[in-house]
Curated annotation (Swiss-Prot):
This is Proteasome subunit alpha type-4-A. There is a cross-link at K40, K64 (Glycyl lysine isopeptide (Lys-Gly) (interchain with G-Cter in ubiquitin)). CDD domains: proteasome_alpha_type_4. One of its GO terms (biological process) is ubiquitin-dependent protein catabolic process. InterPro entries: Ntn_hydrolases_N, Proteasome_alpha, Proteasome_alpha-type, Proteasome_asu_N, Proteasome_sua/b. Belongs to the peptidase T1A family. It is found in: Cytoplasm; Nucleus. The proteasome is a multicatalytic proteinase complex which is characterized by its ability to cleave peptides with Arg, Phe, Tyr, Leu, and Glu adjacent to the leaving group at neutral or slightly basic pH. The proteasome has an ATP-dependent proteolytic activity. Signal peptide: none annotated. Its main location: cytoplasm. Component of the 20S core complex of the 26S proteasome. The 26S proteasome is composed of a core protease (CP), known as the 20S proteasome, capped at one or both ends by the 19S regulatory particle (RP/PA700). The 20S proteasome core is composed of 28 subunits that are arranged in four stacked rings, resulting in a barrel-shaped structure. The two end rings are each formed by seven alpha subunits, and the two central rings are each formed by seven beta subunits. The catalytic chamber with the active sites is on the inside of the barrel.
Length: 250
């Protein structure tokens, strides 16, 4: 019966469902996991990279983490070509705001603006929803550090810890149990690695299979967006007991 209502995004089913939006969410459920955790001194984003070939140059291939502006970054789960369009749109919106008002765009205002674009693609004929979910991490003078999650419907909300992509329900369950409001950035990194280790489909977690980024304030009170290198990731994995040092594994 659903086949009568799932060909267009503008038609509701008798149960009040938009099937094309639900199908877009299914596509995200098959993508690599992304997790965001808010701490008292920053925001941590971590994502699972789907390494499809050993020939892929992972050191130059960004798949999960993207910088939108100096004070905002995001993690992505879903169809990457869709994500690239929306990320470029967000970057332009942020730059236009800065040009007009001579100050960074508030994080929630940027998220809301992008979600308005996503919502439009669920309401007009001849379009399909963007098959991508975002975790936005940022800081502004109005609300400090913030973490937002948005889905293909254009809905968004502020979170203390959130997960999107494959096995997101299991990840959310662990986050709900182990998250602490007063956690430091280092503790948030440890929790993110723990969650990804328990929810990833692969047997072992290595630096080639993940991306880790942090948004925090420097001592001079400027916002810093830092993406960990593979070498730094390996050290973190060893430090938190996720993997063994190379000397021990050989």
């Amino acid at each position: 019966m659903s086949r009568r209502y799932d060909s267009r995004t503008t038609i509701f089913s008798p149960e009040g469902r938009l099937y094309q939006v639900e199908y877009a969410m299914e596509a995200i459920g098959n993508a690599g996991s992304a997790i965001g955790i808010l701490s008292k001194d920053g925001v941590v984003l971590i994502g699972e990279k789907k390494v499809t070939s050993k020939l892929l140059q992972t050191s130059t291939s960004a798949e999960k983490m993207y910088k939108i502006d100096d004070h905002v970054a995001c993690a992505v789960a879903g169809i990457m070509s869709d994500a690239n369009i929306l990320i470029n749109t967000a970057r332009v919106q942020a730059q236009r705001y800065t040009f007009m008002y001579q100050e960074p765009m508030p994080v929630e205002q940027l998220v809301q603006s992008l979600c308005d674009t996503k919502q439009g693609y669920t309401q007009f004929g001849g379009l399909r929803p963007f098959g991508v979910s975002f975790l936005f991490a940022g800081w502004d003078k109005h609300h400090g550090f913030q973490l937002y999650m948005s889905d293909p419907s254009g809905n968004y909300g502020g979170w203390k810890a959130a997960a999107v992509g494959a096995n997101n329900q299991a990840a959310q369950s662990i986050l709900k149990q182990d998250y602490k409001d007063d956690a430091t950035r280092e503790e948030a990194v440890e929790l993110a690695l723990k969650v990804l280790t328990k929810t990833m489909d692969s047997t072992s977690l290595t630096s080639e299979k993940l991306e880790l980024a942090e948004v925090y304030l420097t001592p001079s009170k400027t916002v810093k967006y830092h993406v960990h290198s593979p070498e730094s990731l390996t050290k973190l994995l060893v430090k938190h007991g996720v993997t063994q040092p190379a000397a021990e594994t050989s």
